[in-house]
């Protein structure tokens, strides 16, 4: 659990140094997107394999792939290599959290799991806070490569504990139909979409055959994905659940917040290090208030939801986050890290409340047997939104940065990556040009923050889609049986980090238990 949360936050603070050393700012977004897309596509596979071949064996296999990917990332000597290795690392990352949650469901009773969730909350919160700090410290004092190597001792320790200590309970092994067509079409349409969004208007004209073909191919593969999911006996994404208004609203809001959240998290360290001129360690400290905001929202969000209901909590969360997003658009070369930390407190509090409400609204709108599936849909859409959001933010920033650097250095062939390498920036950029470079990056990243604020505003408009009811009411209305959300809501406070908030609710009431229910309906919960 610690490793999953740590890996989700540790890389961002090292990215300015990485792209500076590897000279690949044009591929900035793909370091995040490749990891997310690989993780999204493989989580359902790992979940099914765990049912078919045993939790321990599959967990160790996934951890091995993740650790090999971490070593390869640390050995990368070009951006293309790093992107490829990040995708490989994402294949293993898709196993760690969901299979660990399933192991928890196997080992503990429902009553015990309620207590265990408190431990998970503490672990996720702690890892999410120290992740950026560790990433910055390692980058400044050792090398950016250590943000990947640090996974190795933690991962080995976890694998040894599982291997030696865990006694896997006897259980029926379930055969599953793997939705290979769904996986292939999902990867196809998302990769083509991310490619078009990231390179359109910058590397290729929007009207060019490359971009038009990519977008057309994405639409065709999306249609194929929908058809595949409708026909599959065990789909990655059970589309029938989108007929439920509360779940549909939660998915839309989760997508928009994923786009906003990942856009801010991925590019804010770049602003702190390049524009303000601080170290990677300072950039890590700047992100800490965002994670603290998530923790506070997690601690009180469940109780608040019981009092005010879904729509009011979402509206309150957006009302908190939008001022923070707006203040981020006001940052410039004269801003301080204290100002950014202040802004991120509001963003973290707001996002924490909204994401918690989305997850519980989705869970509360379905039967207990489908609760894990609903949780997975919300998490799936958030991560998918994150991959798309990072691509959009990168396109906006790089397009603006190219124009601004061209204006600042007319006639010069400027490589923006030169300004990001601590070892070379002072030699290659004359002191007189440093201010122009800072202003160019500031203006470009301003466009990123404006884009994030617009996405957040769209989320506010979607508040009306969210049901008014309080926990328990939606399931009563939809299914006419006793609500179980009251047992879930207080412990849903474990949604404390950008990479983990939806999975935490899954193990509480939606985990698949061998021999019970219908595996095909529950497994897709691991698609997030």
What feature does the model see in each segment?
Residues 140-152, 199-210, 279, 399-453:
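A membrane-interface helix-boundary motif in multi-pass transporters
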Residues 153-171, 188-199, 218-231, 459-467:
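C-terminal membrane-cytosol helix-exit motif in multi-pass small-molecule transporters
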Residues 171-176, 234-240, 405-409, 470-481:
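Short, Lys/Arg-enriched, Gly/Pro-containing loop segments at transmembrane-helix junctions
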Residues 2-45, 143, 181-183, 190, ...:
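Transmembrane core module of solute transporters
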Residues 47, 53-64, 77-81, 99-102, ...:
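C-terminal module of multi-pass small-molecule transporters
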Residues 154-191, 241-243, 409-417:
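Central mid-sequence intracellular linker of multi-pass
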Residues 1-164, 297-302, 307-308, 312, ...:
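Transmembrane-helix bundle of Major Facilitator Superfamily
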Residues 227, 246, 360, 423-528:
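Transmembrane-helix exit segments and adjacent C-terminal regions of multi-pass membrane proteins
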């Amino acid at each position: 659990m610690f490793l999953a949360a740590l890996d989700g936050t540790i890389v961002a603070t090292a990215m300015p140094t990485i792209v500076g050393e590897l000279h690949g700012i044009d591929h900035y977004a793909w370091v995040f997107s490749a990891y997310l897309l690989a993780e999204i596509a493989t989580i359902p596979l790992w979940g099914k394999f765990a049912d078919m071949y045993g939790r321990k064996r599959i967990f160790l296999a996934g951890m091995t792939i993740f650790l090999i990917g971490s070593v390869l990332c640390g050995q990368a000597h070009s951006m293309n290599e790093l992107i490829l290795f990040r995708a490989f690392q994402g294949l293993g990352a898709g196993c760690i959290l969901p299979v660990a949650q399933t192991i928890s469901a196997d080992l503990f009773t429902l009553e015990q799991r309620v207590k265990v969730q408190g431990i998970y909350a503490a672990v996720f919160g702690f890892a999410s806070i120290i992740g950026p700090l560790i990433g910055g410290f390692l980058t400044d004092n050792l090398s950016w490569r250590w943000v990947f190597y640090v996974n190795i001792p933690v991962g080995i320790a976890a694998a040894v504990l599982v291997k030696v200590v865990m006694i896997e309970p006897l259980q029926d092994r379930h055969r599953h139909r793997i939705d290979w067509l769904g996986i292939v079409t999902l990867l196809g349409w998302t990769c083509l979409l991310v490619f078009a969004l990231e390179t359109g208007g910058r590397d290729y004209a929007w009207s060019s055959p490359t971009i038009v073909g990519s977008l057309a191919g994405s639409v065709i593969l999306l249609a194929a994905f929908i058809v595949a999911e409708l026909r599959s006996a065990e789909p990655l994404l059970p589309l029938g659940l989108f007929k439920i208004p509360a779940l549909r609203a939660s998915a839309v809001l989760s997508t928009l917040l994923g786009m906003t959240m990942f856009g801010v998290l991925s590019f804010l360290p770049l602003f702190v290090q390049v524009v303000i001129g601080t170290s990677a360690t300072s950039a890590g400290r700047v992100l800490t208030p965002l994670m603290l905001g998530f923790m506070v929202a997690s601690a009180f969000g469940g109780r608040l939801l019981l009092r005010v209901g879904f729509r009011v909590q979402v509206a309150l969360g957006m009302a908190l986050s939008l001022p923070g997003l707006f203040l981020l658009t006001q940052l410039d070369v004269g801003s301080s890290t204290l100002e950014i930390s202040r802004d991120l407190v509001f963003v973290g509090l707001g996002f924490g409340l909204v994401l918690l409400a989305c997850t519980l609204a989705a869970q509360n709108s379905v039967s207990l047997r489908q609760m894990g599936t609903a949780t997975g849909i919300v998490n799936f859409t958030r991560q998918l939104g994150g991959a798309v959001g990072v691509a959009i933010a990168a396109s906006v920033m790089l397009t603006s940065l190219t124009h601004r650097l061209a204006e600042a250095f007319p006639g010069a062939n400027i490589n923006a990556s030169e300004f990001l390498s601590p070892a070379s920036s002072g030699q290659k950029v004359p002191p007189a040009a440093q201010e122009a470079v800072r202003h160019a990056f500031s203006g470009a990243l301003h466009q990123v923050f404006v884009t994030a604020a617009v996405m957040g505003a769209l989320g506010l408009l979607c508040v009306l889609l969210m049901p008014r009811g309080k926990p328990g009411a939606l399931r009563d209305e939809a299914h006419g049986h006793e609500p179980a959300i009251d047992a879930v809501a207080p412990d849903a406070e474990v949604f404390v980090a950008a990479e983990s908030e939806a999975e935490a609710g899954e193990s509480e009431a939606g985990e698949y238990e061998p021999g019970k229910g219908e595996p095909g309906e529950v497994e897709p919960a691991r698609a997030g």
